[in-house]
Amino acid sequence: GCGFPIARAVAIVSLATACVMDAALGPYQGKETGETALLRSLLSRFGKGDIAVMDRYYCSFMMIAALLANNAQVCARKHHLRHSDFRRGIRLGKYDHWIMWKRPQRPEWMDEETYLRIPETLILREIRYWIVEKGRRTKSVTIITTLLDHRKYDKQSIADLYGFRWN
C-alpha cells in the first residue's frame, strides 16, 4: 500500500439509540490484537439487563461464558464451522431447541485460574429461521442465544432482535 497505518476496531453500539457506548482500538498485527481480544477488553461494559447481539465471529464458548459471567445475555449468529442437529437436545418447537456446549481446551491467552472458573457446560438455545426476499435466494440463519425461556422470548422475537443489528 501507500504506507498508511491500519488498525483494528471493535465498538459496542446501543441497539436502542445507535450511539457508540464504547470502543477499543488496536494494532492490525501482533499478539492479542484480534477483534475477540479487543472485545474481551470491553466486557466490563456489559451487565445485568444487557443483551449482546453479535456476529458469528464472536459466537464462541469462551465469549458467551464471559458475557454470562457479567450477567449479560447473548444473541449471536452461529459460527459456520459449528454443526447443528435439531434432532438432538430438548425440542421447544420446529427448529428451536436447547443444546449443551462443552468447554473447550484452555486457550493460550487464558491463565489456568480463569479457565477453572468457567463452567464446564453451557445450556444454550439454538433457533433457525429463513429470510425470504423477492428476487433473491432464500437464506437460512441459525442463532445461538442465552434467552432460554421460549414462552417469554419466542422464536420470531429472537430472529427480529438479531435482524435489528443491521438497522
PLM feature segments, named:
Residues 2-167:
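Single, function-defining residue in the core of a domain
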